[in-house]
């Protein structure tokens, strides 16, 4: 088992800076776990990555934001979070299958902070998505831009989808739109492919949990891009049931086109 050094307390960091630091720290640990355990037993590797990254993040959040609640994929869901004004929604290892496969770099670490606002519009205010196997690059709400994405609406829309579970609605909207499906692993890697301009959209309709999309959605919206349910309604977080049935993340200019095609497909 990798035993990371005790982290320095960083109480002076802003929430956005802390999110980025947590994502990078967990990413470094996951790379160490990968190197130490190897790929001979994928289940053992994935379990170790999930568990150790989760322990690191929970330990740091307890030390550095002791009054905040946490919703993690790898921890018991303490429903006291429903009364909290600040909830960290984290996925210590997004894409366990990809993490456990040699040569795959499309896995991520998700860190998001949900805050209850006084105007009745709670939202993800700070978030970071790390792609550890790609140089541990971290996409963060306080610095992200959409500059890498191409301008305008392309003739063919490149849409990131699951390699194993492509959404059925995709086949229906292909009747009216020119679409090129692009298979990418984890949810975070798919969403950041939109930020990087590698794809135009990320569409999912097979069901997810809040930790799968909270950080990617926060980063997307901070970059001026679009993130919603497939019917165009907002993505809601810190709900009693953290299940989210579907989502669309895309460049802002293609959102009306895709939402319209999806609505037509459902009629």
From Swiss-Prot:
The question of whether Nucleotidyltransferase is a record keyword is answered with no
**Any phenotype upon disruption?**
Strains lacking this gene show normal growth, do not require exogenous inositol for growth, and show no differences in levels of phosphatidylinosotol mannosides (PIMs), lipomannan (LM), lipoarabinomannan (LAM) or mycothiol (in the absence of exogenous inositol).
Write the record's keywords in alphabetical order, separated by commas. Answer: Hydrolase, Magnesium, Metal-binding
The record's annotation in Gene3D superfamilies points to: 3.40.190.80, Fructose-1,6-Bisphosphatase, subunit A, domain 1
Keyword Disulfide bond attached = no
Residues where Mg(2+) 1 binds: 73, 91, 93
Q: Which cofactor does it need?
A: Mg(2+); Mn(2+)
| Annotated GO biological process | 3'-phosphoadenosine 5'-phosphosulfate metabolic process; sulfate assimilation
**What would be one Pfam family of this protein?**
Inositol_P
- Influence of pH: Optimum pH is 8.5-9.5 for PAP phosphatase activity, 9.3 for IMPase activity, and about 10 for FBPase activity. IMPase activity shows a dramatic decrease at low pH. In contrast, IMPase activity is highly stable at alkaline pH, with more than 60% activity remaining at pH 12.
Pathway, per Swiss-Prot/TrEMBL? Sulfur metabolism; sulfate assimilation
Q: Which top-rank group of organisms is this from?
A: Bacteria
- Tell me its EC number(s), please: 3.1.3.7, 3.1.3.11, 3.1.3.25
What are the protein's GO molecular function terms?
A: 3'(2'),5'-bisphosphate nucleotidase activity; cobalt ion binding; fructose 1,6-bisphosphate 1-phosphatase activity; inositol monophosphate 1-phosphatase activity; magnesium ion binding; manganese ion binding
Catalytic reaction(s) noted = adenosine 3',5'-bisphosphate + H2O = AMP + phosphate; beta-D-fructose 1,6-bisphosphate + H2O = beta-D-fructose 6-phosphate + phosphate; a myo-inositol phosphate + H2O = myo-inositol + phosphate
Control of this protein's activity is summarized as: PAP phosphatase and IMPase activities are inhibited by Li(+). To a lesser extent, PAP hydrolysis is also inhibited by Na(+) and K(+), with IC50 values of 150 and 250 mM, respectively, so much higher than IC50 with Li(+) (0.5 mM). Exhibits about 50% residual IMPase activity at 5 mM Li(+) and about 10% at 30 mM Li(+). Na(+) and K(+) have no significant effect on IMPase activity between 0 and 200 mM.
Question: What does the entry report on temperature?
Answer: Optimum temperature is 62 degrees Celsius for IMPase activity. After preincubation at 70 degrees Celsius for 2 minutes and then being assayed at 37 degrees Celsius, more than 95% activities of IMPase and FBPase are lost.
Binding, Mg(2+) 2: 91, 94, 212
PANTHER family noted in UniProt: 3'(2'),5'-BISPHOSPHATE NUCLEOTIDASE 1
Family classification: Belongs to the inositol monophosphatase superfamily.
Q: How does it assemble?
A: Homodimer.
Query: What does the protein in this record do?
Result: Phosphatase with a broad specificity. Its primary physiological function is to dephosphorylate 3'-phosphoadenosine 5'-phosphate (PAP) and 3'-phosphoadenosine 5'-phosphosulfate (PAPS). Thus, plays a role in mycobacterial sulfur metabolism, since it can serve as a key regulator of the sulfate assimilation pathway by controlling the pools of PAP and PAPS in the cell. To a lesser extent, is also able to hydrolyze inositol 1-phosphate (I-1-P), fructose 1,6-bisphosphate (FBP) (to fructose 6-phosphate (F-6-P)) and AMP in vitro, but this might not be significant in vivo.
Q: What is this protein called?
A: 3'-phosphoadenosine 5'-phosphate phosphatase
Gene this protein is translated from: cysQ
């Amino acid at each position: 088992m990798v035993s990371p050094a005790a982290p320095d307390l960083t109480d002076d960091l802003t929430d956005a800076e802390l999110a980025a630091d947590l994502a990078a720290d967990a990413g470094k640990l996951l790379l160490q776990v990968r190197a130490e355990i190897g790929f001979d037993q994928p289940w053992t590797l994935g379990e170790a990555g999930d568990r150790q990254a989760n322990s690191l993040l929970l330990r740091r959040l307890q030390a550095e934001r002791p009054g905040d609640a946490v919703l993690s994929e790898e921890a018991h869901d303490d429903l006291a979070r429903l009364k909290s004004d600040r909830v960290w929604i984290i996925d210590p290892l997004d894409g366990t299958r990809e993490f456990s496969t040699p040569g795959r770099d499309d896995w991520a670490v998700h860190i998001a902070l949900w805050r209850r606002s006084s105007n009745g519009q709670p939202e993800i205010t700070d978030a970071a998505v790390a792609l550890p196997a790609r140089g541990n690059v971290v996409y963060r709400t306080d610095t992200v831009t959409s500059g890498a994405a191409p301008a305008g609406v392309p003739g063919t829309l490149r849409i990131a989808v699951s390699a194993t579970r492509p959404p059925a609605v995709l086949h229906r909207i292909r009747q009216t739109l020119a679409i090129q499906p692009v298979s990418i692993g984890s949810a975070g890697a798919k969403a950041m492919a939109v930020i990087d301009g590698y794809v135009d959209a990320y569409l999912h309709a097979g069901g997810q949990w809040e930790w799968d999309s909270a950080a990617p959605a926060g980063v997307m919206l901070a970059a001026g891009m679009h993130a919603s349910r497939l019917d165009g309604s907002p993505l809601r977080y810190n709900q009693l049931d953290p299940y989210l049935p579907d989502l669309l993340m895309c460049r802002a200019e293609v959102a009306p086109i895709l939402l319209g095609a999806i609505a037509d497909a459902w009629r």
